[in-house]
Amino acid sequence: MRREDKSTLKNGHIDTMIKPKGRRIGLIRLSAIGDVCHAVATVQALQRHAPEDDITWIIGRTEAALIADLPGITFVIFDKKQGLKGFREVLKAIPAPFDVLLHMQVSFRANLLAAVVPAKIKWGFPKNLSKELHGLAINRRVPMPETPHVLEGFQHFAYALGVPAFTPKWSIPIPQ
């Protein structure tokens, strides 16, 4: 039986997740260009809070083309057109298990991927926002409002890692 963390928010943070910096953080947000752009604000808040953390973003091919020039992030491309080979390619590109995986998507394909990506802690959405077997791919649920805007929901993933409340900021380099 899966044991879920019962942590609660204290001062805007998950009290059990405030850890030393220098973590290997994985993130899954494969698709939906608008949602990927919202996730950028959360990733950049994580970078400002803990620049020593190593962030790897597992992302779709089209979405990666939009944000591939973001500094300080390793991108692993998931090509859904490759089927099972796409899953194997992602796993080959991850050199070691993540300390933390932020599973920021509830599609069936993303849930399958999160289930096989190695990580000690896998944060996902609360039950009311989960679907397509999301709960089977995670071992902790991020507390958040009942019906958050996508951007607000993503911010709560950063709070779970000890980032204090922040105003979203985007800095997306545009190639010449």
Question: Where do the language-model regions lie?
Answer:
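Catalytic machinery of carbohydrate-active enzymes
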Residues: M1-Q176
